[in-house]
Regions:
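N-terminal phosphate/diphosphate-binding loop that engages ATP/GTP or pyrophosphate donors
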Residues: 1-13, 18-30
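Short phosphate-coordinating micro-motif centered on Lys-Gly-acidic
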Residues: 21-26, 32-95
Length: 95
């Protein structure tokens, strides 16, 4: 399945574009309709469809740092998301 929807207080849409040939295939799967809905959309392999992503967004990258370790890189695109990231820096996290 290329698109999975998980209902909840905020709907979560998981879009896996790995098997798509390119950005044009997004029309066939209803990508614009999903992006217009209220909810959170997570796009796996988003670099394959970079020209169709919203200009304002959060980009997350999972990086392999060892056999059993990963790190998460979060990049803000747009003022709203820069403010969200700035707010996250004030939160204490446990390791």
């Amino acid at each position: 399945t290329i698109i999975n929807e998980y209902p909840g207080r905020l709907a979560l849409f998981h879009v896996d574009v790995y098997r798509l040939a390119g950005p044009g295939d997004l029309d066939d799967i209803g990508f614009d309709e999903i992006m217009a809905q209220d909810g959170l959309t997570v796009i796996e392999w988003a670099e394959k469809v970079a020209d169709r992503l919203p200009k304002e967004r959060l980009s997350l990258s999972l990086l392999i740092t060892g056999d059993r370790s990963r790190s998460i890189e979060i990049r803000a695109c747009g003022k709203r998301y820069v403010e969200i990231i700035d707010g996250m820096s004030d939160v204490e996290y446990d390791n």
